[in-house]
């Protein structure tokens, strides 16, 4: 069920793109804990007591395998540009976690904040941080919040297929050649998939902050978003002629 949920979430079933191959879950006898590789996901033998216990697997232990399978299904670079490797796979993790009836991990306490949500809103809404930056104040779970909020909002207004349609748009459109362009293209395609002008949403969450930094994400690269790139993307969204979200 875990694998099927992730496949359905990204529109593989809806758009007749289901993979005929199975997802391989391998037991590993080393110290790698859990990981995703090109042809399998691996789990150290010490985790078997939890992963092979149905009650634990479907509750406290669901995040790990959902996270690793999420890596296997990440769509690069459209929804996995530089800096998002340990972020956007967790959209899948959250979907699986909550689909199994568990509380969202984003409701967990974070430091002095009542939840990851609260700290994230402080970091982005109040401090006006660029979404791509991580440090002692912001981690991958804070970066995850806007992606999950898109799911929750579109679901609340009856758009159950938002991410299915967004993934399909990412699959059929031309990949961008830089991480910064990929981030901005995501804002455009998300607006298109939702039928809503999401400019203000992405402004609040730091996607439209100009930045030029070296970013480390397993490999290193330059992450550049300029004012002119931002202006061009905002205009493209405006040209879609979409209404703004309500509420």
Roles of regions detected by a PLM:
Residues 4, 8, 161-164, 168, ...:
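Polar/charged alpha-helical tracts
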């Amino acid at each position: 069920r875990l694998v099927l949920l992730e496949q359905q979430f990204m529109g593989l079933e809806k758009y007749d793109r289901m993979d005929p191959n199975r997802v391989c879950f391998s037991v590993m006898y080393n110290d790698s804990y859990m990981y995703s590789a090109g042809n399998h996901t691996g789990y150290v033998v010490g985790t078997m007591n939890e992963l092979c216990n149905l009650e634990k697997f479907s509750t406290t232990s669901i995040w790990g395998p959902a996270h690793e399978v999420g890596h296997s299904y990440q769509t690069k670079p459209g929804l996995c540009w530089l800096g998002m490797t340990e972020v956007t796979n967790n959209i899948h993790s959250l979907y699986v976690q909550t689909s199994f009836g568990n509380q969202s991990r984003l409701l967990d306490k974070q430091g002095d904040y009542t939840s990851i949500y609260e700290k994230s809103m402080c970091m982005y809404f109040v401090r006006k941080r660029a979404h791509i930056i991580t440090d002692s104040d912001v981690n991958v779970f804070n970066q995850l919040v806007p992606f999950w909020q898109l799911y929750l909002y579109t679901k609340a207004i009856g758009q159950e297929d938002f991410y299915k349609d967004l993934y399909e748009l990412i699959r059929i459109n031309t990949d961008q050649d830089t991480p910064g362009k990929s981030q901005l293209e995501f804002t455009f395609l998300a607006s298109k998939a939702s039928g809503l002008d999401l400019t203000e949403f992405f402004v609040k969450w730091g996607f439209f902050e100009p930045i030029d930094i070296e970013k480390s994400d397993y490999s290193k690269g330059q992450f550049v978003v300029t004012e002119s790139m931002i202006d061009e993307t905002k205009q493209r969204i405006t040209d879609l002629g979409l209404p703004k979200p309500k509420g």
